């Protein structure tokens, strides 16, 4: 039992540190207190903690009477916490992912889609992108013009980039899923989508579909992993040539939404 516990603790520690990124780790080492951390580090640490907590609670509630039915309470909580942490980074699993409920699969996909911090070992859209977009959405609903957090205002440029990243990521995942459902018509949509999101987040979790893949599926999954790791926005910027700056601006128009 002890080697298993030690191994699990090491996996959790390495997964969390790997998902934070070296900028946050170095900042933590130098700052020594939360108040002295940079805005980036505060965002990453706060969002990471909330995602781990939310993932743990919902995974426990959803799988308590399913994949973790025959476990004790402490073991259930430990497994829920482990899956919540590793789903966003390392991709290790202590339960059979192929037997989880559909709502649980959707939960894990959401965590994998968000991923870890920028400049970390994780893929996905990144936690900073997620939290900036979330803040902008809530402030828009509240009719608040200024987007700020931790007494710092968020630049409109970052908000724009966050929404662009999320939209092109959703479009990319949707396109790849559409292609794979054509190639692998015998596999349920939810399982194909899970594989694509897992690859995009460079997580590696699978619902035991490797043996059922057809033709070019493995190659497509590899491409998705590379895109998730490098970042679709970075790839798009590298492929699309920059536009020459204009020395003039048009009069603003009004559009009804």
Predicted regions and their residues:
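Transmembrane helical segments that form the transport core of multi-pass membrane transport proteins
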Residues: 69, 73-114, 122-127
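C-terminal structural cap/anchor segments
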Residues: 118, 124-194, 202-204, 229
């Amino acid at each position: 039992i002890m080697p298993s516990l030690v191994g699990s603790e090491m996996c959790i520690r390495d997964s969390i540190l790997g998902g934070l990124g070296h900028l946050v780790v170095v900042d933590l080492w130098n700052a020594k207190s939360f108040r002295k951390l940079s805005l980036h580090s505060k965002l990453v640490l706060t969002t990471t903690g909330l995602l781990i907590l939310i993932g743990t609670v919902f995974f426990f509630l959803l799988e308590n009477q399913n994949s973790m039915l025959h476990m004790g309470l402490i073991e259930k909580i430990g497994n829920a916490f482990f899956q919540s942490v590793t789903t966003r980074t390392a991709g290790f699993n202590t339960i059979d992912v192929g037997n989880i409920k559909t709502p649980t699969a959707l939960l894990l996909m959401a965590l994998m889609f968000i991923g870890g911090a920028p400049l970390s070992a994780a893929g996905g859209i990144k936690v900073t992108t997620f939290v900036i977009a979330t803040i902008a959405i809530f402030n828009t609903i509240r009719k608040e013009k200024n987007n700020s957090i931790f007494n710092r205002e968020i630049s409109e440029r970052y908000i724009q980039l966050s929404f662009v990243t999320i939209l092109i990521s959703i479009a990319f995942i949707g396109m790849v899923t559409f292609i794979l459902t054509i190639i692998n018509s015998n596999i349920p949509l939810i399982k194909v989508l899970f594989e694509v999101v897992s690859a995009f987040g460079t997580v590696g979790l699978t619902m035991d579909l490797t043996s059922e893949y057809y033709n070019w599926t493995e190659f497509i999954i590899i491409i998705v992993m590379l895109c998730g790791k490098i970042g679709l926005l970075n790839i798009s910027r590298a492929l699309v040539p920059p536009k020459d700056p204009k020395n003039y601006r048009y009069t603003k128009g009004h559009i009804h939404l």
